[in-house]
Amino acid sequence: HCGQEFYRSKDGLGNTYNTLDHINAVNWSLVDENQEDIETLKQMIQLRKENGGFKYETIQEVNEYVSTNHFDYRILRYCVKQNKGKYQEIVAYFNPSYYDFEINDMDEYEVIYNDHESRTYLAPISMKIFGLKR
């Protein structure tokens, strides 16, 4: 998916493995325009590399160590427990709505990723990730 991080659409084609280079080429002029999102993507890749909980290989592992919850029919809470890594548990909140959400009961957790200043405020169309250290 080369170029995906720059929001290329590959001219709207769904499967481009056999198309010309100009369809699959990275448009480097979009780097500056999307630098903040690129940095976020780098942080998410690093988080995944450092935490085995994002790399479970079997459905049994996923069923045992991963859980999800919905709040107010809008907010998704994704929780991963892991045996290795800096954190014993990682909790991510995703808010795809246009409404604010207050996060509670995370005082013992370290903020891993926060796209807004507040620790407990989840802004519209945002995410926040917490980790419980070992």
What name fits each language-model region?
Residues H1-M106:
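Loop/helix patches that line or flank the sugar-binding groove of alpha-linked glycan CAZymes
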Residues E117-R134:
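C-terminal beta-strand-rich structural cap/linker in extracellular carbohydrate-active enzymes
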Residues E33-Q35, E110, I129:
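A broad, structure-centric signal for solvent-exposed, well-ordered loop/edge residues
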Residues D105-H116:
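Solvent-exposed beta-hairpin/edge-strand motifs
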